[in-house]
A protein has these predicted regions:
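Bulky hydrophobic/aromatic content
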Residues: 11, 25, 53, 60, ...
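A structural signal for short hydrophobic beta-strand segments in well-ordered beta-sheet cores
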Residues: 63, 156, 184, 243-244
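Short aromatic/basic micro-patch
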Residues: 22, 150, 175, 254, ...
């Protein structure tokens, strides 16, 4: 069996249990045989058990059997597939990959976003992170020639279709974009991750990958108009986002965040449909920023 089909079967099993909830093996098999993923074969108990083990290894998803409820199978830890988890991202990626693989006949009608280079360094960096080895990177900032850096790789983050490496040079934590890396070499020298370090906690007070601890943490209130509240509900700007007021004309959201350039840029992209209400100094900063942009059009 082709590896791509096997992965599709793993994804199918997880998504089926997520969609339909508790199911007996017979019920799962009925759904299985109605789908192309079955490849014309019924789902035997041995195949189901192998896939069940593989799903645990690959996604960390535990499929349990409730012997008190007619031997129905269910996902025992659905929280592992919550937003912003590696397991959720892997499942979504494989799900999309499986769907696209079955859609070659209409490939010219499925348009994908261009993704910058850099993925070729992922495997090397992941290996270095797993084994706690430092790396040598030939890095080229925009408009500059390449230069070598020697860092301890702490974590990887995917943001707006770009991969970033959070690393330490021994004094500071620095984030590098993988698409600006010309080469990556794993060194023999090892490093020790600081006790209690959490990449999620490190980025938790910021929007995106640009971090600056000199920017104070602020409680921010934003008013959204039109359809923007719906977009913010379905895809929150930040984990601290809360909807605190809802009316027919607008909705107010609050954030507890350090408002760096990335966050202000994201708010400004909302145009007239996003307005900073508080704090007043941040409202003025945004006003000055927008005025600066408007000044560029004064000659028209």
């Amino acid at each position: 069996m082709k590896p791509s089909l096997i992965f599709s079967q793993y994804v199918w099993l997880v998504n089926t249990l997520r969609r339909y909830g508790r199911m007996t093996l017979e019920e799962i098999n009925d759904k299985w045989q109605d789908d192309e993923v079955a490849d014309g074969n019924p789902l035997s108990r041995s195949t189901f058990n192998r896939h069940r083990d593989a799903v645990l290894d690959m996604f960390g998803v535990i499929i349990e059997c409730d012997t008190q409820d007619g031997y129905r199978y269910y996902i025992d830890n659905p929280e592992v597939l919550d937003d912003d988890t590696l397991e959720r991202w892997m499942l979504n990626s494989l799900t999309v990959g499986a769907v696209l693989a079955d859609s070659q006949s209409i490939h010219d009608r499925i348009l994908l976003e261009n993704v910058p280079a850099g993925e070729e360094h992922l495997q090397t960096l992941i290996q270095a992170i797993k084994t706690s080895h430092k790396v040598e990177i030939c890095y080229a900032r925009f408009g500059h020639s390449g230069y070598n850096i020697y860092v301890a790789p702490y974590a990887l983050k995917l943001w707006h279709q770009r991969w970033y490496l959070l690393s330490s040079n021994g004094k500071y934590l620095i984030t590098y974009s993988l698409d600006r890396m010309r080469s990556v070499k794993v060194l023999d020298q090892t490093f020790k991750l600081p006790e209690g370090f959490s990449a999620e906690a490190y980025f938790s007070e910021f929007y995106g990958v640009l971090t600056d601890n000199e920017v104070p943490l602020k409680h921010i209130r934003v008013r959204a108009y039109g359809q923007t509240p719906n977009y913010m509900r379905t895809l929150p700007f930040h984990s601290s986002q809360k909807e605190v007021e809802t009316t027919d004309n607008y909705s107010d959201f609050t954030f507890d965040i350090r408002p760096t350039y990335d966050f202000l840029n994201a708010l400004s992209s909302g145009g007239p449909d996003l307005e900073i209400l508080e704090p007043k100094e941040l409202r003025k900063e945004m006003k000055d920023w927008l005025q600066s942009s408007l000044d560029k059009y004064k000659d028209e």
